[in-house]
Amino acid sequence: MMKTVLYICSSFLSLCSFGQDTAHTAQYRQKLLKAYPDCITGFDKNYVVFKNGTRLLFDDRKVKTLTEQYSNADIEDQLKAAYIKGKTPKPAEFDDPGRIRNDSFFKCMYGATPAAVKQNLATITWLPGLAPQSLQVTRINGVDKQLQAVSDELEKLPAFLKYVGKAAGTFNWRVIKGTTRPSTHSYGIAIDINTDFSNYWQWDNKTTDENRKIPDYVNRIPFEIVAIFEKHGFIWGGKWYHYDTMHFEYRPELLAD
C-alpha cells in the first residue's frame, strides 16, 4: 500500500513538473516569435525553425552548472533568467539575465563570420543634434532603426549628455575578455556608452573569473537612460550580477510580455 501511495505521489509530482515545463516552453516560444518575426517562422517539436531553413535545438534537456550554461547554453537556457523591465534593485548573486546565450542562435540571424555580419551593417547618426557620431549596427531585425529611435529620445534629455555623448563602440567582432564566447558586439546588436561614467565588474574587481563573488555592485548610469533603451528592445548590462553599466544589447525576447 505504501509503495502504491509513493508511486502515485511521485507520478503526480512528475505530471505537475511536466505541466510547468510545458507552460514555460510555450511562453518562451511566444517571446521568440514576437521578438524576431523577420527571422523565426515557428517551431517543429523541439526545434526553432528559421526563415533561412536552419533548425536549432531549443532544449537539450541537460541540467547544467553556471559555467556550463555560459559555455554551452541551449536556446531555452538563454530565456530562463528573467530580465525585469523598469527600475530594479541591485542584481541578486549570479543573476545575469541575458549573459547566458546560445551563440548559434545569434549567428544564424546576424552572421557567423565578420564578413557575413558586415554585409548587413547600417550607419546611424548618434545624437545628431547634440554630439553627432557615426555608429554601425546591423539592420537585421530593425536594430538600426531601434537604436536611432533611442538616440532621438536621448536628445530630449541634454542633461544626460555626458553619459551618452561619447559612445565607446558598437560593431566589433571579438570575444568577451577571459572567455572564448563571442561578445554581442560581434553581431552588431550592442552599444557601449561613455566609459568615463561607467563601471564593469572585471575592471572594478581586477578579475575575469565568473565564479568569483563580486563584493560590491557599482553604477553611475541614470535610470532614465536605461528606460529609453528598454523601450526600444535593448537590455542593460547594469542589471547583471557581472555588471557592465556601459553596455546595452538588442534582446527583445527578454523584454517581450
List each model region and its residues:
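Bacterial Sec-dependent N-terminal signal peptides
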Residues: 1-21
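Cell-envelope/glycan interface and biosynthesis
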Residues: 24-240
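A cross-kingdom marker for long, charged
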Residues: 231-257
